[in-house]
Curated annotation (Swiss-Prot):
Superkingdom of origin: Eukaryota
Function description: Leghemoglobin that reversibly binds oxygen O(2) through a pentacoordinated heme iron. In root nodules, facilitates the diffusion of oxygen to the bacteroids while preventing the bacterial nitrogenase from being inactivated by buffering dioxygen, nitric oxide and carbon monoxide, and promoting the formation of reactive oxygen species (ROS, e.g. H(2)O(2)). This role is essential for symbiotic nitrogen fixation (SNF).
PROSITE patterns in the cross-refs: GLOBIN, PLANT_GLOBIN
Expression by tissue: Accumulates in root nodules after inoculation by bacteria of the genus Rhizobium.
Residues the record lists as binding heme b: 44, 93, 96
Alphabetically ordered keywords of this record: Cytoplasm, Heme, Iron, Metal-binding, Nitration, Nitrogen fixation, Nodulation, Nucleus, Oxygen transport, Phosphoprotein, Transport
Record-given protein name: Leghemoglobin 49
Length: 146
């Protein structure tokens, strides 16, 4: 079964909830660094800070990550596949030293952050929609890395 309109709608609505509160970006990176402290150096806006400090660059990067997952949901619903809009994403991830376990950590952080942003709207269906959309994006990035 393909990605449904309902799944796309779930991702879109929770994406809007995420964007409304900048603290979710800090939460996202906090979860990543709790799981993978060594990943701190991969993010230029974090590597020289004592911890996760809110900044315009952090906000922009988090919105970009979550936005790409949202775009993946739209693409999956429309065409059944994810095509990267930014052709350099593979090279950037290679340059930063991203490996498969990093994708798992980011997925977990993304889901925990969306759960927090969604509040009482969180459901298994919402989780699955984000998981499928993220997996589509991760697959496209990994393909671009090979």
């Amino acid at each position: 079964m393909g990605f449904t309109q309902q799944q796309e709608a779930l991702v879109n609505s929770s994406w809007e909830s995420f964007k409304q509160n900048p603290s979710y970006s800090v939460l996202f990176y906090t979860i990543i660094l709790e799981k993978a402290p060594a990943a701190k150096g991969m993010f230029s806006f974090l590597k020289d800070s004592a911890g996760v400090v809110d900044s315009p660059k952090l906000q922009a990067h988090a919105e970009q990550v979550f936005g790409m997952v949202r775009d993946s949901a739209i693409q999956l619903q429309a065409t059944g596949e994810v095509v990267l809009k930014n052709g350099s994403l593979g090279a950037i991830h290679i340059q930063k030293g991203v490996v498969d376990p990093h994708f798992v950590v980011v997925k977990e952080a993304l889901l925990k952050t969306i759960k927090e942003a969604s509040g009482d709207k969180w459901s298994e269906e919402l989780s699955i929609a984000w998981e499928v959309a993220y997996d589509g994006l991760a697959t496209a990035i990994k393909k671009a890395m090979s």
